Protein backbone atom coordinates (compact mmCIF):
# COMPACT_ATOMS: atom_id res chain seq x y z
CA UNK A 1 0.00 0.00 0.00
CA UNK A 2 1.36 3.40 -0.95
CA UNK A 3 2.33 5.54 2.02
CA UNK A 4 1.39 8.87 0.57
CA UNK A 5 -0.88 11.52 1.95
CA UNK A 6 -4.61 10.91 1.70
CA UNK A 7 -6.24 11.85 -1.59
CA UNK A 8 -8.16 15.14 -1.39
CA UNK A 9 -11.93 14.96 -1.36
CA UNK A 10 -13.31 15.94 -4.74
CA UNK A 11 -16.40 18.10 -4.91
CA UNK A 12 -19.43 16.50 -6.56
CA UNK A 13 -21.66 18.83 -8.53
CA UNK A 14 -25.39 18.46 -7.80
CA UNK A 15 -27.52 16.80 -10.44
CA UNK A 16 -29.32 19.13 -12.88
CA UNK A 17 -32.93 18.13 -12.11
CA UNK A 18 -33.13 17.73 -8.33
CA UNK A 19 -30.08 19.85 -7.40
CA UNK A 20 -29.03 17.10 -5.00
CA UNK A 21 -25.43 16.06 -4.42
CA UNK A 22 -26.62 12.73 -3.00
CA UNK A 23 -28.53 11.94 -6.19
CA UNK A 24 -25.58 13.00 -8.35
CA UNK A 25 -23.41 10.45 -6.53
CA UNK A 26 -26.10 7.82 -7.02
CA UNK A 27 -26.21 8.58 -10.76
CA UNK A 28 -22.43 8.10 -10.81
CA UNK A 29 -22.87 4.73 -9.07
CA UNK A 30 -25.40 3.62 -11.71
CA UNK A 31 -23.18 4.85 -14.56
CA UNK A 32 -21.37 2.23 -16.66
CA UNK A 33 -18.59 2.91 -19.19
CA UNK A 34 -18.84 6.68 -18.70
CA UNK A 35 -22.39 6.87 -20.11
CA UNK A 36 -23.75 9.45 -17.72
CA UNK A 37 -26.77 10.45 -19.82
CA UNK A 38 -27.92 6.81 -19.85
CA UNK A 39 -27.45 6.62 -16.07
CA UNK A 40 -29.45 9.84 -15.62
CA UNK A 41 -32.31 8.45 -17.72
CA UNK A 42 -32.31 5.26 -15.63
CA UNK A 43 -32.28 7.07 -12.27
CA UNK A 44 -34.82 9.74 -13.25
CA UNK A 45 -37.07 7.09 -14.80
CA UNK A 46 -36.84 4.99 -11.63
CA UNK A 47 -37.65 8.01 -9.45
CA UNK A 48 -40.61 8.76 -11.73
CA UNK A 49 -41.94 5.23 -11.13
CA UNK A 50 -41.27 5.58 -7.39
CA UNK A 51 -43.17 8.89 -7.23
CA UNK A 52 -46.16 7.42 -9.09
CA UNK A 53 -46.24 4.36 -6.86
CA UNK A 54 -46.01 6.39 -3.64
CA UNK A 55 -48.66 8.86 -4.90
CA UNK A 56 -51.00 5.98 -5.75
CA UNK A 57 -50.39 4.31 -2.41
CA UNK A 58 -50.96 7.46 -0.36
CA UNK A 59 -53.68 8.93 -2.58
CA UNK A 60 -56.39 6.85 -4.13
CA UNK A 61 -55.97 3.08 -3.82
CA UNK A 62 -57.27 2.79 -7.37
CA UNK A 63 -56.87 0.19 -10.04
CA UNK A 64 -53.83 1.76 -11.74
CA UNK A 65 -50.63 1.47 -9.75
CA UNK A 66 -48.29 1.73 -12.71
CA UNK A 67 -47.48 -2.00 -12.54
CA UNK A 68 -48.29 -2.75 -16.17
CA UNK A 69 -45.19 -2.25 -18.26
CA UNK A 70 -47.05 -1.94 -21.58
CA UNK A 71 -47.98 1.10 -23.61
CA UNK A 72 -51.15 1.74 -21.63
CA UNK A 73 -49.04 1.88 -18.43
CA UNK A 74 -46.73 4.43 -20.04
CA UNK A 75 -49.66 6.68 -21.01
CA UNK A 76 -51.15 6.41 -17.54
CA UNK A 77 -47.82 7.33 -15.90
CA UNK A 78 -47.49 10.53 -17.90
CA UNK A 79 -51.02 11.66 -17.01
CA UNK A 80 -50.17 11.75 -13.28
CA UNK A 81 -47.39 14.31 -13.71
CA UNK A 82 -43.76 13.82 -14.59
CA UNK A 83 -40.96 14.44 -12.06
CA UNK A 84 -39.34 16.75 -14.61
CA UNK A 85 -42.31 19.13 -14.48
CA UNK A 86 -44.22 18.37 -11.26
CA UNK A 87 -42.50 19.87 -8.20
CA UNK A 88 -44.52 17.77 -5.71
CA UNK A 89 -43.68 14.53 -7.51
CA UNK A 90 -40.02 15.55 -7.55
CA UNK A 91 -39.98 16.24 -3.80
CA UNK A 92 -41.84 12.99 -3.09
CA UNK A 93 -39.42 10.95 -5.21
CA UNK A 94 -36.35 12.52 -3.59
CA UNK A 95 -37.76 12.01 -0.09
CA UNK A 96 -38.53 8.35 -0.84
CA UNK A 97 -35.04 7.84 -2.28
CA UNK A 98 -33.41 9.37 0.82
CA UNK A 99 -35.57 7.14 3.03
CA UNK A 100 -34.46 4.07 1.10
CA UNK A 101 -30.81 5.09 1.35
CA UNK A 102 -31.15 5.67 5.12
CA UNK A 103 -32.64 2.21 5.62
CA UNK A 104 -29.87 0.51 3.60
CA UNK A 105 -26.96 2.34 5.29
CA UNK A 106 -25.00 0.02 7.62
CA UNK A 107 -23.75 1.23 11.02
CA UNK A 108 -20.93 -1.28 11.58
CA UNK A 109 -18.87 -3.64 9.45
CA UNK A 110 -16.14 -6.19 10.11
CA UNK A 111 -12.51 -5.73 9.12
CA UNK A 112 -9.84 -8.42 9.22
CA UNK A 113 -7.13 -7.94 11.85
CA UNK A 114 -4.20 -10.29 12.17
CA UNK A 115 -3.11 -10.90 15.77
CA UNK A 116 -0.47 -13.48 16.67
CA UNK A 117 -0.95 -15.73 13.65
CA UNK A 118 -4.75 -15.64 13.82
CA UNK A 119 -7.03 -13.46 11.73
CA UNK A 120 -10.00 -11.95 13.55
CA UNK A 121 -13.04 -10.26 12.08
CA UNK A 122 -13.14 -7.07 14.13
CA UNK A 123 -16.36 -5.00 14.13
CA UNK A 124 -15.75 -1.29 13.50
CA UNK A 125 -18.08 1.68 13.13
CA UNK A 126 -18.37 3.19 9.67
CA UNK A 127 -17.93 6.85 8.74
CA UNK A 128 -20.97 8.53 7.17
CA UNK A 129 -19.36 8.90 3.73
CA UNK A 130 -18.63 5.16 3.58
CA UNK A 131 -22.13 4.31 4.86
CA UNK A 132 -23.66 6.26 2.00
CA UNK A 133 -21.23 4.77 -0.53
CA UNK A 134 -22.04 1.21 0.59
CA UNK A 135 -25.79 1.92 0.52
CA UNK A 136 -25.55 3.30 -3.04
CA UNK A 137 -23.43 0.37 -4.17
CA UNK A 138 -25.79 -2.22 -2.65
CA UNK A 139 -28.91 -0.59 -4.11
CA UNK A 140 -27.39 -0.69 -7.60
CA UNK A 141 -25.96 -4.20 -7.15
CA UNK A 142 -29.21 -5.76 -5.98
CA UNK A 143 -31.28 -3.82 -8.51
CA UNK A 144 -29.10 -5.41 -11.21
CA UNK A 145 -29.89 -8.87 -9.84
CA UNK A 146 -33.67 -8.40 -9.99
CA UNK A 147 -35.88 -9.96 -12.67
CA UNK A 148 -37.86 -6.96 -13.94
CA UNK A 149 -37.59 -6.19 -17.63
CA UNK A 150 -35.75 -2.85 -17.59
CA UNK A 151 -33.16 -1.33 -15.28
CA UNK A 152 -35.57 1.54 -14.57
CA UNK A 153 -38.12 -0.88 -13.10
CA UNK A 154 -35.47 -2.92 -11.29
CA UNK A 155 -34.04 0.17 -9.61
CA UNK A 156 -37.49 1.59 -8.79
CA UNK A 157 -38.64 -1.66 -7.19
CA UNK A 158 -35.40 -2.04 -5.22
CA UNK A 159 -35.84 1.51 -3.85
CA UNK A 160 -39.48 0.82 -2.95
CA UNK A 161 -38.54 -2.49 -1.31
CA UNK A 162 -35.80 -0.77 0.69
CA UNK A 163 -38.27 1.84 1.97
CA UNK A 164 -40.56 -0.99 3.10
CA UNK A 165 -37.67 -2.81 4.82
CA UNK A 166 -37.20 -5.71 2.41
CA UNK A 167 -35.20 -6.49 -0.70
CA UNK A 168 -31.64 -7.56 -1.44
CA UNK A 169 -29.94 -4.38 -0.23
CA UNK A 170 -31.70 -4.56 3.16
CA UNK A 171 -30.77 -8.25 3.46
CA UNK A 172 -27.12 -7.36 2.77
CA UNK A 173 -27.21 -4.70 5.51
CA UNK A 174 -28.69 -7.20 7.97
CA UNK A 175 -26.02 -9.77 7.05
CA UNK A 176 -23.25 -7.22 7.68
CA UNK A 177 -24.79 -6.27 11.04
CA UNK A 178 -25.22 -9.95 11.97
CA UNK A 179 -21.56 -10.62 11.18
CA UNK A 180 -20.49 -7.68 13.35
CA UNK A 181 -22.73 -8.86 16.20
CA UNK A 182 -21.31 -12.39 15.99
CA UNK A 183 -17.75 -11.04 16.24
CA UNK A 184 -18.45 -8.55 19.02
CA UNK A 185 -16.05 -10.46 21.29
CA UNK A 186 -13.15 -9.20 19.16
CA UNK A 187 -14.18 -5.54 19.38
CA UNK A 188 -11.26 -4.82 21.75
CA UNK A 189 -8.87 -5.41 18.80
CA UNK A 190 -10.25 -2.29 17.17
CA UNK A 191 -7.59 0.14 15.95
UniProtKB/Swiss-Prot annotation:
InterPro entries: Ribosomal_uS7 (IPR000235), Ribosomal_uS7_bac/org-type (IPR005717), Ribosomal_uS7_CS (IPR020606), Ribosomal_uS7_dom (IPR023798), Ribosomal_uS7_dom_sf (IPR036823)
Domain of life according to the entry: Bacteria
Cellular compartments per GO CC: small ribosomal subunit
GO biological process terms on file: translation
Alphabetically ordered keywords of this record: Ribonucleoprotein, Ribosomal protein, RNA-binding, rRNA-binding, tRNA-binding
UniProt key word tRNA-binding: yes
NCBIfam families the record matches: rpsG_bact
Oligomer status and interactors: Part of the 30S ribosomal subunit. Contacts proteins S9 and S11.
Protein name per UniProt: Small ribosomal subunit protein uS7
